[in-house]
Amino acid sequence: METLTFNFPAAEPGRGRTLVGCVSSGDLEVLIEPGTAGSLQIQVVTSVNGSAARWAQLFQRLFEGRAWPAVNIDIHDFGATPGVVRLRLEQGFEEIAHD
């Protein structure tokens, strides 16, 4: 098991919180909750050791160059593909946009 932490600039805090996916479905669950203004923080707990570079590249593609709400994201991963990660994050952000 490996725990990874990432930070990106963000706008104002998001209002809602949500849980999408589960570790046994697509091998990934994502919890999104309001964070501190100006900061999007991500913590990944993964069963795949040595995957920090893959996660960093995925998050850079998603979060750099766009104003996201300030949230804390907790990801519990058991070997999900980048496509599943992106899908779950998009689902989560869509959910909090409706709260």
Swiss-Prot record:
Belongs to the MdcC family. GO terms for cellular component: cytoplasm. Subunit of malonate decarboxylase, it is an acyl carrier protein to which acetyl and malonyl thioester residues are bound via a 2'-(5''-phosphoribosyl)-3'-dephospho-CoA prosthetic group and turn over during the catalytic mechanism. It comes from Pseudomonas putida (strain GB-1). HAMAP family: Malonate_deCO2ase_dsu. This is Malonate decarboxylase acyl carrier protein. Its main location: cytoplasm. Covalently binds the prosthetic group of malonate decarboxylase.
